[in-house]
Amino acid sequence: MGVEVVNSGGFEVAPAPFEGKPEKNGKLDQGKGDDAPINFGSVGELPKNAEENNNKVVNSDAPKNAAEEWPVAKQIHSFYLVKYRSYADPKIKAKLDLADKELEKLNKARTGVLDKLRAKRAERSELFDLLDPLKSERKGFNTMFDEKRKEMEPLQQALGKLRSNDGGSARGPAICSSEEELNSMIYSYQYRIQHESIPLTEEKQILKEIRLLEGTRDKVIANAAMRAKIKESMGQKDDIQGQVKLMGAGLDGVKKERQAISARINELSEKLKATKDEITVLENELKTVSEKRDKAYSNIHDLRRQRDETNSEYYQNRTVLNKARDLAAQKNISELEALANAEVEKFISLWCSKKNFREDYEKRILQSLDSRQLSRDGRMRNPDEKPLIAPEAAPSKATPSETEVVPKAKAKPQPKEEPVSAPKPDATVAQNTEKAKDAVKVKNVADDDDDEVYGLGKPQKEEKPVDAATAKEMRKQEEIAKAKQAMERKKKLAEKAAAKAAIRAQKEAEKKEKKEQEKKAKKKTGGNTETETEEVPEASEEEIEAPVQEEKPQKEKVFKEKPIRNRTRGRGPETIPRAILKRKKSTNYWVYAAPAALVVLLLLVLGYYYVL
């Protein structure tokens, strides 16, 4: 017997269609094709050949046996199995999406780091390829340089010996180059002693030098022999120096080439060092990125494990359904019936005993019910009923009404210079508006709680925007409050200005009285003008001190507005007539110059005549 598994309303149902012909007046309606024997199951015998049917055309309608006369309907057994649906937790799904995005970013970052690392390693290998021949070339120049140095060493030693024999040591006298030179020096010292008149101390010194020169005779002879030997083997001193110069020139060329190669090697070595440093940095970065990626992998694995744990009953139910299908294919009705009864009893016991199980199952079938336009209890949904799962609104359109109204309802930020408290009626208006907003929010929260879907949280729905009339009324109230605040500020400023003007007038009157008293006292005592000049800076100091005292209470307040001052200039001291001094008249010197010139001319004329 075939068992068909069909999905219906969260259950696995095996429908039982009736394939026999309906009865008419208590009898079966027999027709053509009903005379074939009916077997259990959906598979029957194959039809006979067309030739045999043509031979038996006459007796085709006549029944032959009871099975053909009374056909038995095809029997189909129906078994009901509970079906568990998979459930995707939105929190776990969001975490998985976020973890997948993070893993994708880390994979991209890792591939980028790997590409950079490959490029740097290729650059390092290129630098190694350039450095290896240069190092081998420098090694060849080093060997050449060492060979030339070895060739020059005997010549330099010979020159050193020749030079060391010429000069003497710091302690003793100079060693002569030959025995003839030594004899001539000794003879010159002896000649001085014999033929020159010198003091005794100098004579003793000369005798001492002669003895020292005689002591160097053996060395002079040995040096002369060695010099002769060197000349025989290597030639004269000039020839040796020429050879050394030639070899030194070749050595300098080798040295320059070696220095150029060394500079190139140093440059490449610096580049190689920088490349190695970059490679180490990239390797560390790759290590950190790999660690982060491994953590992301482990996080995704944990989240998937949590998701599978929540759907463990779904996987168990799937194995049960597969087993039922296998039993149905095998036509093992007894075991299939036992399995169905056991599963149903298990489900009913869990449904009646555990609340969490009921909530979880209802949560799992909500999507199926909603897709089939059914309500929570399985009946057809009415047109006015809301869907079980609210559709997610677009992020651009899902802006709440508060975000549209609150910025308009907020008053403009007042400047810091005017922190004047608003009057009481304005405060009450603001409180009323705040209370109204709170009431609206509480109402919205209550509505959200009522509309919450069991097992899925609150459905997302758009809040109703505030009407234009209410927004206009709120703006009007705000403008009235602002106007009242401005009037209060103006009144306070006017009162402050009047008080300051009264204080200033009183101080000026006191100053005038003091000045008049001082003038009267000076007239009586006959004071000098110096005292009068000293009074002017004192008055100016008092004028400066007065505004400072007035500004002190202003500093305590935040309001800083420059008050309008009506300064009245105080009368200064009476002007005294200046004393007119008699000045001497400037003498004109040209008046004396003319007679002086005449006198000089007369004297010259008289002298001229006197000489003649």
From Swiss-Prot:
Membrane topology term: Single-pass membrane protein
Comp. bias intervals (Basic and acidic residues): 20-35, 374-387, 434-446, 459-498, 505-519, 549-564
Record flagged with keyword Metal-binding: no
GO CC field: cytosol; endoplasmic reticulum; endoplasmic reticulum membrane; plasma membrane; plasmodesma
Residues passing through the membrane, by range: 591-611
Ranges of Acidic residues composition bias in the record: 531-545
Tissue: Strongly expressed in root and shoot vascular systems, particularly in meristematic and sink tissues. Also present in pollen, stigmas and siliques, but not in developing embryos.
GO biological process terms, semicolon-separated: regulation of proton transport
Its job: Promotes AHA1 plasma membrane ATPase activity by binding to a site different from the 14-3-3 binding site.
Protein name (database record): Proton pump-interactor 1
Organism for this UniProt entry: Arabidopsis thaliana (Mouse-ear cress)
Lineage of source species: Eukaryota, Viridiplantae, Streptophyta, Embryophyta, Tracheophyta
